[in-house]
Amino acid sequence: MVERGHGLRCRLTQVAALTVVVVLAQSLGAAAAQATPPSWTEGEHGSGPPAFPAGESRAELRTPPIPWSDLEPDDMWAKPAINHVASRHGWMRDVPRDRRGNWRFKPDALEKRKWWARAMGRAFAPGAEPDPSIRFSDLDTADPFYRWAAIAVQRGWITRGPGRTFKPQNAVTARVVHRSLVRALGMRTTAADIDKLATRDGRRFDTPRFFGVNLLAMRLGLRFNNRFDEAQDVTPDTKLRRKQVAWSLFRATTLDSWVVPYLEDQYAGMELPNMGAGRRSIVRWGIRYVGYPYIWGGEWGFETPSPPAFGRQPGPGFDCSGLSWWALRRDDGGSWEISPPRPHEGWPLPQRTSSAMSRMTKKRLAYVDLRPGDLMFYDGDRDGTVDHVDVFVGNGWALDSSSSVGGVTLMWVETGWYRDHFVHGRRIVPLPRP
């Protein structure tokens, strides 16, 4: 299964490269993994692989959008998504016109569970009928939203609460929205398999709830990475505004057809090598933040203490070097007033940026020499400047936070963009003595 998956992964990687050939053309002739790079200058904004293609179809571009009366300038990033899910399709057209005949979307209102159930039903099962045996203690069968709630529960998109409650007025979280969409896209089994992440000897990691869903949602681009207003970035437990939900539904319904099978194959049989307690602790600590957003200068998984190294951040999240710092660095009583609550103490890593980390090593590692816990450095635009770093966890996988993907994931780095742009590695965690 793993060998088959690896072969198909390589073939699909080639297909993906053809799809984004304009973006990747500059990298095709370069060396994949050089152990002795040139002298690196100071770092630049973190990079990452191109996002999977998705967007408006040609037919949609010919469809005149509804002139929404309540979209503000800071909502413009969501306008294509809103037009797709509420203008062309009507899946999220939940608010009637006002007295003047103006259409409203209420982009900043929290999305209710009953609205989300209806949007999912309209998008993925418009002709379905509910199982009459599904009942709710807080939603009568005569309620117009009952049908959609029952269909959502029947298909496993949304679950009932204690006492057969649906809680129709409650707001949805990112975790709930992303689970609905991952399952609607047919990736339920893949997400469940990812939840069982283990080392070769069968020792499973204590993955957080919906770990597989969070990982696949990041890879699918279901959460918008707001680079210009990072205060709007969300974690898996954030209650979502309607414009954020619109983006998730937009992405899920406009992905190229090869993306889902590509990801299903890539994560099939994912397994990490056997490792000691220290390295295992790094992985266990890192995976709890999968699904957290990319924040430039971000280095904390909770509200920023003072003084942080890169200034106060708008919310929990990490840039690439911040995630590596957070996972590996030992508290020296200097930059961190509060030590992260990790099970491992950490190791000396005084540098904060990817380029500074890349320079401060006496031995630069080639890809074949990497071991779990090693840092991997990349030159995303091939200008002689390291602009990305992640933490290798073995068997071709790395704990990564990139601006293009939009946050923290476990990424396949043995082929594709990561291998093409890899320059060298650095060992922070000493190898065990023979």
What are these regions (language model features)?
Residues 2-35:
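Secretory targeting and sorting signals
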Residues 34-79, 93-117, 121-147, 154, ...:
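Feature responds to low-complexity, polar/acidic, surface-exposed segments characteristic
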Residues 79-83, 87, 114, 118, ...:
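Solvent-exposed, polar/charged alpha-helical surfaces in well-ordered, non-transmembrane soluble domains
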Residues 86-91, 121-129, 153-157, 182-190, ...:
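Sec-exported extracytoplasmic/periplasmic mature domains
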Residues 264-340, 429:
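N-terminal capping segments
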Residues 270-271, 419-434:
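Low-complexity, Gly/Ser/Thr/Pro-rich intrinsically disordered linker/tail segments
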Residues 272-273, 278-283, 325, 333-408:
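...with weaker cross-activation on analogous glycine-rich loops/strands in unrelated enzymes
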Residues 293-318, 371, 378-421:
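Glycine-rich catalytic cores of cysteine/serine-nucleophile enzymes that process amide/ester linkages
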